[in-house]
Structures are given as C-alpha cells and as structure tokens.
Amino acid sequence: MASNGADRDPEIDRLLEAKARELTKKMKYSGVVELSKENFDDFLKTFRVAVVDFWATWCAPCFMLEPIIKRLALEMPDVGFGRLNTEEEPEIAAKYYVMSLPTVIIFKDGEPVDQVVGVVPKKILQDRIKAYLED
C-alpha cells in the first residue's frame, strides 16, 4: 500500500532533511579541496576529522606529498582533505604555527589534534588519521 505522506513521522522527515543537507555539504568538498580564508572554517566544520596540507609553490617536498594526500582522499571518503597555499594565506598558517613545509595538521571537531612535518610515507599518515576516527 502506497503512502501519500500524510502518515509520515515528522521527526523522521527532519532527520532525513538534516542528513541530506550534510551529504550535500560534504559533496561540495569531495576530493582534495583548495582552501582559502573564504572556505577554511566552513571546511573544518563540515567534517568530524579533517586533514589540511600546508604547502607553498617553492617547496619541492610539498609536491612529493601531494599525490599521497590525493590517494588518501580517495581511500578515506569520511575525512575531509584540503590544501592551503601558505603564500596566499599566511595568516592561517601563522594561526596554526606552521613554521616548516610541508606541514599536515589533523583536525577533529574543528580543533587541531595532530601535526606531521615533512614528507612521510602514506601508511604513517593514514595511521595517524585513523587514530582520530576510532572514537
């Protein structure tokens, strides 16, 4: 028997709408997102765990890390992955005390919880990120 919607639970409708909004927002940030002051805070709020790669155009090791970040973004769809060019956004880099490049900061619930400086193997970075997904 088909439902005409009259007997639908309003609480279920509210939850479905909230989930749809959440998924739509996450789709906006799929893959590795180029971050700026315009979208940085919103990006962190969108994901329970977010990873930000701080880089610069003159930094050769940063370009070695980029494919690792891209692979992790494909393999870990529940985690937000972003890259922030420190030359274009020095204020954000300074806010998080980024002194060396590349620096990867892992955020949980919008707060920095871990930091990796330099190029590291994918497995090491992946394990560090997974540690914040478990609780």
Where are these regions (language model features)?
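Proteins that catalyze or organize thiol-disulfide redox chemistry
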Residues: 1-51, 57-63, 67-80, 90-91, ...
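Conserved residues in the N-terminal Rossmann fold of short-chain dehydrogenase/reductase
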Residues: 83
